[in-house]
């Protein structure tokens, strides 16, 4: 069950007030040996929208204009204006960062979170879909209403950078930019249950 509290602001007279907000996406609980709860490498917050939505086009303008070195992924100017296709599997809450908090001890090979810790990798993902070897209507496997797929067929070089997060203890947390590619290990090879919460 997802719980969301809307980010809200109000104007009272001439003063701006901002209300506290929080967002809990889901809890992940895996038992030793589980091989059913892995997630393939992806980015949340839309897939095909990144090429066709006017706000995403503004966000990625430097990438599409072949000035990818100038792309600033931390400029959030248009990120709260993107429009995603409706889907029960995709969160529609604007998040400046995504997070994972350990509720139990966990680490590599425990079926835990993986990242490609390169924020500007989005430049590779977006432009890769525009190369001649990719069918015009395919966008490297991106599908409406799904997360942005990062796969072996088109992104094998990028996937070499996929690493598991380090050993974490209850209360430890890790945060990543919404353009960072992430996954969950296919199998839990550890000996204890692990529980983590996405925030």
Feature locations, PLM:
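Acidic/His-leaning functional-site neighborhoods
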Residues: 127-131, 186, 196
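A short hydrophobic beta-strand segment most commonly corresponding to one strand
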Residues: 117, 190-199
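Short beta-strand His + acidic residue motifs that chelate non-heme Fe in jelly-roll/DSBH
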Residues: 182-188
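A short, structural micro-pattern
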Residues: 21, 93-95, 189-191
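Single conserved hydrophobic/aromatic residue that forms the stacking wall/gate
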Residues: 2-18
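Extended, Lys/Arg-enriched charged tracts that mediate electrostatic binding to polyanionic substrates
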Residues: 14, 23-83
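Double-stranded beta-helix
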Residues: 58, 62-177, 181
């Amino acid at each position: 069950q997802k719980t969301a509290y809307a980010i809200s602001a109000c104007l009272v007279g001439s003063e701006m007030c901002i209300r506290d907000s929080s967002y809990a996406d889901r809890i992940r609980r895996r038992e030793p040996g589980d091989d059913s709860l892995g997630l393939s490498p992806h980015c949340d917050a839309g897939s095909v929208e990144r090429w066709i939505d006017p706000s995403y086009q503004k966000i990625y303008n430097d990438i599409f204009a072949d000035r990818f070195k100038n792309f600033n992924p931390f400029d959030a100017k248009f990120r709260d204006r993107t429009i995603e296709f409706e889907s029960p599997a995709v969160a529609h809450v604007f998040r400046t960062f995504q997070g994972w908090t350990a509720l139990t001890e966990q680490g590599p090979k425990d079926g835990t979170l993986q990242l490609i810790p390169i924020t500007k990798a989005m430049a590779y993902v977006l432009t890769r879909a525009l190369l001649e070897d990719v069918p015009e209507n395919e966008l490297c496997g991106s599908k409406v209403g799904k997360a942005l797929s990062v796969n072996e067929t088109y992104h094998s070089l990028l996937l070499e950078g996929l690493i598991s997060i380090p050993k974490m203890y209850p209360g430890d947390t890790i945060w990543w930019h919404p353009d960072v590619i992430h996954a969950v290990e296919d199998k839990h090879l550890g000996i204890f249950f692990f529980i983590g919460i996405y925030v």
